[in-house]
Amino acid sequence: MTIALTHLQRLEAESIHIFREVAAAFAKPVMLYSVGKDSSVLMHLAMKAFYPAKPPFPFLHVDTTWKFREMIAFRDQMAQKLGFDLLVHVNEDGVRDNINPFDHGSNTHTHVMKTVALRQALDKYGFDAAFGGARRDEEKSRAKERIFSFRNAQHVWDPKNQRPEMWKIFNTRIASGESIRVFPLSNWTELDIWQYILQENIPIVPLYFAKERPVVERDGMLILKDDDRMKLRPGETVENRLVRFRTLGCYPLTGAIESDADTLEAIVGEMLTARTSERQGRLIDRDEAGSMEKKKREGYF
């Protein structure tokens, strides 16, 4: 008897297959846990893939020290609730040099506190495969990246040297020092993510739900004043608006959207009519043309 799977069931099955393939083929995998909605879905799928056992790999959070406070609280809450092995890495050199998004700009801050920090962590622990929650519908450089994305010993991605992935057969062979970035959510869309979160009742950071929040209008974006480190420019004022976030990152570099969607059902309804990418809320994507591909070539996820 043939069982017809729904769209979400097919995506779920593909992602679970990818998790198990990596666990079987690599010596020391890790899952990057950014605490956002995609990471929450990824974590849920990882738990399903190996149930009733726990995932056979740790979860790594690269802390830039500028994440939303609610993200950090949620991260610690989920680690305690689910009991997974959580590793937190901070680029202490960047902290010592006081690298921050206000004084050094988004490009330098992202490179030092995210890209370099990630490379440090992967080298420190010797991970040979790293799961991430990137999706092809997010951004053009991610659209052309393979599910199993090869990186050389310097963590560099070469888009002209990607491995074929015909018939869902993945090449897992690597030499010493090389690694693979793995994206089980490659074929998911933002709408798929939200419909799956609703279907599975997956916990997410409250910042995704609309609420009155103190924001500053800057460079066409609504920036949440999350703590006293937020430096106001001349003429700027903080005002409370009903906003939520479609994407999460470092709070000075992440724009909110005006919305009254305060339930999962309302968010799904909003996504059904959305005509813009969630990445429009990321200041780091505005650094320069092709900025995401440049960052990925340097080792960014």
UniProtKB/Swiss-Prot annotation:
Disordered: region residues: 279-301
GO biological process, one term: sulfate assimilation
Record keyword Aminoacyl-tRNA synthetase present: no
EC code(s) of this entry: 2.7.7.4
Pathway(s) the chain acts in: Sulfur metabolism; hydrogen sulfide biosynthesis; sulfite from sulfate: step 1/3
Gene3D superfamilies in UniProt: HUPs
InterPro entries with a match to the protein in the record: PAPS_reduct_dom (IPR002500), Rossmann-like_a/b/a_fold (IPR014729), SO4_adenylTrfase_ssu (IPR011784), Sulfate_adenylyltrnsfr_sub2 (IPR050128)
Keywords, ordered alphabetically: ATP-binding, Nucleotide-binding, Nucleotidyltransferase, Transferase
Tree of life domain: Bacteria
Enzyme class: transferase
Catalytic activity: sulfate + ATP + H(+) = adenosine 5'-phosphosulfate + diphosphate
A molecular function GO annotation: sulfate adenylyltransferase (ATP) activity
Its biological purpose: With CysN forms the ATP sulfurylase (ATPS) that catalyzes the adenylation of sulfate producing adenosine 5'-phosphosulfate (APS) and diphosphate, the first enzymatic step in sulfur assimilation pathway. APS synthesis involves the formation of a high-energy phosphoric-sulfuric acid anhydride bond driven by GTP hydrolysis by CysN coupled to ATP hydrolysis by CysD.
Subunit-structure text: Heterodimer composed of CysD, the smaller subunit, and CysN.
UniProt family annotation: Belongs to the PAPS reductase family. CysD subfamily.
The protein's name in its UniProt record: Sulfate adenylyltransferase subunit 2
Native source species: Mesorhizobium japonicum (strain LMG 29417 / CECT 9101 / MAFF 303099)
The organism's taxonomic lineage, starting at the top: Bacteria, Pseudomonadati, Pseudomonadota, Alphaproteobacteria, Hyphomicrobiales
Gene: cysD
